[in-house]
């Protein structure tokens, strides 16, 4: 049995994809980049914005900073809650894990203050013992926000912790910290092949499947 379950936010707890994609489209238009199919921006959901703008669209460092500025100007005002919703079964999952004594943590590359706004908006903050996110352009990578949470909570036995996320970055970040990871497919922003490629420890289709893994895994 695990004692801690670390959760990604976007695409794992909430479907924030519509707002993220809207804001990315607005930012990219400032550079003359038109997006014909919104699905082309699904990879935006997961990695740090700087990596997405650089790797997907070839923006240099200066323009990456501008793109992030344009993105956040739109997202913070218009998109943080637009089309955003809690996935079916998530609240039941969190309630069940809390009732079983599992400590719950959010580990997201989203700025911490925005993560808190989203969790507060959906009345989910009450389930979490700690929220770890990016702060002032620090801790922007998944392995960094996970490491920060581990340090803050003074967790020494890594076998007590499992990560839950919807993208390969969650699996990779967890592994860099010595943790196992559950890859979730219900969000619709990842694929089975993506998780197989990075060797996710578990791959699930429904939120409540997480309970059996957290409670049934032998780690002693």
List each model region and its residues:
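Active-site neighborhood of HAD-like aspartate-dependent phosphohydrolases
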Residues: 1-43, 57, 191
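Metal-dependent phosphoesterase signature
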Residues: 54-91
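A short, structured active-site edge motif that brings together acidic residues
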Residues: 125-140, 160
């Amino acid at each position: 049995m695990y004692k801690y379950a670390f959760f990604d936010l976007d695409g794992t707890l909430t479907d924030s994809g519509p707002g993220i994609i809207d804001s990315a489209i607005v930012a990219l238009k400032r550079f003359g980049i038109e997006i014909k199919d919104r699905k082309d921006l699904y990879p935006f959901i997961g990695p740090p914005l700087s990596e997405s703008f650089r790797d997907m669209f070839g923006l240099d460092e200066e323009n990456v900073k501008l793109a992030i500025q344009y993105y956040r100007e739109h997202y913070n005002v218009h998109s943080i809650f637009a089309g955003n919703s809690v996935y079916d079964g998530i609240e039941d999952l969190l309630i069940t894990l809390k009732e079983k004594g599992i400590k719950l943590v959010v580990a997201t590359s989203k700025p911490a203050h925005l993560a808190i706004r989203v969790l507060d908006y959906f009345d989910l903050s009450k389930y979490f013992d700690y929220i770890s996110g990016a702060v002032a352009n620090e801790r922007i990578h998944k392995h960094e926000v996970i490491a920060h949470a581990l340090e803050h909570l003074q967790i020494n036995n890594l076998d007590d912790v499992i990560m839950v996320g919807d993208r390969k970055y969650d699996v990779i970040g967890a592994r860099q910290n010595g943790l196992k990871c559950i890859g979730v497919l219900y969000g619709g922003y990842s694929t089975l092949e993506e998780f197989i490629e990075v060797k996710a420890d578990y791959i699930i289709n429904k939120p409540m499947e997480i309970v059996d893994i957290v409670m049934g895994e032998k780690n002693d």
